[in-house]
Amino acid sequence: KAEQKITSGTYELNTDMDYNALVNSMSSRSGSRMTVSITIPEGYTVDQIFALLDEKGVSTVETLQNVAANHDFKFSFLKGVLPLGDYHRLEGYLFPDTYEFYMGGGESAAIQVLNKMILRFDQQFPDALREQAANMGYSVHDIVTIASLIEKETDGSDQTSIASVIYNRLNNPNYETVGYLQIDAALVYATGRVITQADYQTVDSPYNTYLYKGLPPGPI
């Protein structure tokens, strides 16, 4: 009778293995679990990231959404973001990079996957940048949200001008837009489709920066 704990996942096994060898190979201490290298492109939303991880056999979309929504990841910059229960709370915090992940596994494996990407974000946002943001009156969440607006509102050619527009509208409530950012990309994120001018006044969402002043609830 096997006493080792079997870890769920995808394994590379040899057909010549006997029973004990098979169990040993699938124990939590085993190095035989199959891995896959995945590149998360810049600009991917959480939905796109989860779909990619599912496609590559790392975890299912459902498991990733559940973990993202309900697991309390212990990073200070996640305090005060969207509440537990909404997987979009990790939007903007899953750092785009190339990772090596184990294939398969349940909730605990999904926690490790997401924690790895959040940790990579943490490593790319040093204390000096956090202090600079605080001195400007912004939280890490604010800065990540602003950066996502800049990235999604442009094709990469005029990010400086878009950044200037956003900060002017945030810092000067008497600016011509009186606190409304009027960022189309945020409304596209909210609706998940191509928008029309009619949507500016009809889509009731905090991501509609034509109807709601200031920053949307989080990155897009």
Where are the language model's segments positioned?
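Bacterial extracytoplasmic/cell-wall-associated proteins, especially those involved in peptidoglycan
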Residues: 57-59, 73-220
